[in-house]
Amino acid sequence: MQKICVIGAGTMGSGIAQVFAQNGFEVILRDIDMKFVEKGFGTIEKNLQRNVDKGKITADEKNEILSRIRGTTNLEDAKEADFVVEAAIENMDLKKQIFKELDEICKMETILASNTSSLSITEIASATKRPEKVIGMHFFNPVPVMKLVEVIKGLKTSEQTFNVVRELALKVDKTPIEVKEAPGFVVNRILIPMINEAIGILADGVATAEDIDEAMKLGANHPIGPLALSDLIGNDVVLAIMNVLYEEYGDSKYRPHPLLKKMVRGGLLGRKTGKGFFEYK
């Protein structure tokens, strides 16, 4: 397995492309518009330059890594890939459409993975004629730094597919954990309701955003507070995951807080928009 195709050049897609390229894989980075591909390349270049400045890699190594990544807007280019990982937005209809097209384009032996943070792998796989070769490969943000990968089996995912993806995660210096499909998987089922609760505490006026985050950092030994983490993940992404949990389980503990909804409606999405629970310059 030498050639990887990453669908989506946003925050997650560009990070995934970087990690594979750093570990010797040829990468096709695809998005619907060249401006998104170029933005993804810019993010990768900036990340690698930071590593050069810190003395972790040389300028030549940086250029070598970048040379392994090829940008495209043509989904047909995925036919060259031995492995595809999709990192589009968290929208089931969109993901199913992408997987339907990939199923028609890609070689029959190609494994199709989704970086979804909460959606059903079984449902995504239903759009294909190869459900045994569809799997979840959930990376965490920032991808080049975070070690964990949740490897999620759908109802029909084969053991062989799981083993290949688990080995692939190890090859890119990640720690894979095996997850049976369930809404939110492991990390987000625990983490996102905690963030939602912190938003509720803020909305109730119990404490300021700064003090809520300080409390969790010093009182629970968290490296980052829940509200700053929500800003980092993207408040729109947090809301999308809460909606999935609430729709799937129907349990009020997963109901997204009205303040979170209001912030997303108002475009206060966190770091990517410069303002969320905190301001960013």
UniProtKB/Swiss-Prot annotation:
GO biological process, one term: butyrate metabolic process
Signal peptide: none
Site (Important for catalytic activity): H138
InterPro entries found in the cross-reference section: 3-OHacyl-CoA_DH, 3-OHacyl-CoA_DH_CS, 3-OHacyl-CoA_DH_NAD-bd, 3HC_DH_C, 6-PGluconate_DH-like_C_sf, 6PGD_dom2, NAD(P)-bd_dom_sf
Keyword Metal-binding annotated: no
GO molecular function, one term: NAD+ binding
Enzyme class label: oxidoreductase
Catalytic activity, as annotated: (3S)-3-hydroxybutanoyl-CoA + NADP(+) = acetoacetyl-CoA + NADPH + H(+)
Pathway: Lipid metabolism; butanoate metabolism
Enzyme Commission number(s) of this protein: 1.1.1.157
Pfam families tied to this protein: 3HCDH, 3HCDH_N
Entry keyword set: Fatty acid metabolism, Lipid metabolism, NADP, Oxidoreductase
Coiled coil: none
NCBIfam families, sorted: PRK05808.1, PRK07819.1
Sequence similarity: Belongs to the 3-hydroxyacyl-CoA dehydrogenase family.
Full protein name: 3-hydroxybutyryl-CoA dehydrogenase
Record organism: Thermoanaerobacterium thermosaccharolyticum (strain ATCC 7956 / DSM 571 / NCIMB 9385 / NCA 3814 / NCTC 13789 / WDCM 00135 / 2032) (Clostridium thermosaccharolyticum)
Gene: hbd
